[in-house]
């Protein structure tokens, strides 16, 4: 038995790492979405922004960044690209010029029905049942929420 397979080192194997499994799954699902989004001119990050706006149009840029789990500085180039594609527009309310609201254009709203087939195709590509996908999503959200709470506690202590 090599050192790497002894019980004390088993948890150090790459294939045993949760972070590695999550990274592989993230890359695979992003590529799978990407292939299907490419004909629409969207990448995965842009698609997530569009999903958030289809749910709630007119979000502030800061709220939108939080909603899609991006830093505001990472959201800006995505919004510029979506604006260049005439899918969104950024506006400043007259009563608060410091705030930037992101609104869908007619073209942005019209794009939503085209994405239903993409969702189905990606779900089918996973090979998981609807129930398995729902359970996986729930576990991943629970994991993210728990780790975020832990990070918040660590930040409060520091």
Label each residue range with its predicted role.
Residues 23-26, 51-55, 116:
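Short, locally clustered residues in the helix-turn-helix/winged-helix DNA-binding domain
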Residues 30, 80-138, 145-148:
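Charged, amphipathic alpha-helical coiled-coil/dimerization segments
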Residues 1-40, 134, 142, 147, ...:
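N-terminal leader segment of winged-helix/HTH proteins
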Residues 56-60:
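Short capping segments at the starts of secondary-structure elements
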Residues 65:
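The alpha-helix within a helix-turn-helix
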Residues 21, 28, 48-49, 110:
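Pre-recognition alpha-helix immediately N-terminal to the DNA-recognition helix
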Residues 61-62, 73, 80, 100:
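Residues within helix-turn-helix
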């Amino acid at each position: 038995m090599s050192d790497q397979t002894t019980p004390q080192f088993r948890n150090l194997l790459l294939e045993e790492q949760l972070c590695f499994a999550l990274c592989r799954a993230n890359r695979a699902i992003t590529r799978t979405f990407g292939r299907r989004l490419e004909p629409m001119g969207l990448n995965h990050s842009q698609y997530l922004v569009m999903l958030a706006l289809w749910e709630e149009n007119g979000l502030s840029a800061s709220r939108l960044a939080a909603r899609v789990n991006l830093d505001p500085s990472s959201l800006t180039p995505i919004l510029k690209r979506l604006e260049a594609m005439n899918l969104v527009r950024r506006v400043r309310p007259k009563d608060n010029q410091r705030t930037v609201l992101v609104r869908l254009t007619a073209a942005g709203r019209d794009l939503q029905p085209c994405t239903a087939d993409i969702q189905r195709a990606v779900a089918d590509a996973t090979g998981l049942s609807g129930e398995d996908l729902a359970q996986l999503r729930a576990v991943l959200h629970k994991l993210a929420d728990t780790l975020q709470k832990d990070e918040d506690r660590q930040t409060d202590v520091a």
